[in-house]
């Protein structure tokens, strides 16, 4: 989990090309494979939600779509105003792809320079490079950051704000409430440590 200050610093320092990608990951808590699989048809601006019912993956044989292993993975994730604006910017600058269709899905939002969908490995590498560049010029370094850490950070922030655990479980698509409750325990410990440090400073 990254701190609030680090959460703000990361998108700001990102290359302009990846600013909205990182912001959306921080503001939605999506799994990176869910994020990469987003298509234009998954955006519901009228109801401010994201339709999550598939993941985009890639192996040695190529791209493929995988549906959630449990029904908990199928959900409508709330879209904040900030995330909504980021998606609008993504759509505005989106280049027309090669008309690629993967297992019946088309119009993917996040494409590389060749017009092919981005993958989890690409974002993992990109975040590593962004952190490395940031740390080169700042005295207070960022920790290791991965797409999963951004998801964990999103979830922890909502737990710290005492969101109803069942609601948070739904948003995150956790198969078990225990996964969600463990994050509440982590959030409580983190909050206690921060408060203790502020009191004895």
Question: Where would I find each of the regions flagged by the language model?
Answer:
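Single conserved hydrophobic/aromatic residue that forms the stacking wall/gate
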Residues: 1-8
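DNA/chromatin major-groove-contacting recognition/catalytic segments
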Residues: 9, 61-65, 161, 182, ...
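Basic, Lys/Arg- and aromatic-enriched nucleic-acid-binding interface segment
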Residues: 9-38, 46, 72-74, 82, ...
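Short, basic (Lys/Arg/His-rich) helix/loop patches that form interaction surfaces
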Residues: 11-18, 28, 77, 95-108, ...
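Conserved tyrosine-mediated DNA breakage-rejoining catalytic core shared by Y-recombinases
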Residues: 28, 37-95
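Short, polar N-cap/turn motifs at the start of nucleic acid-interacting alpha helices
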Residues: 42-49, 163-183
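Residue-level detector of conserved, well-ordered beta-strand and adjacent loop positions
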Residues: 53, 80, 111-113, 185
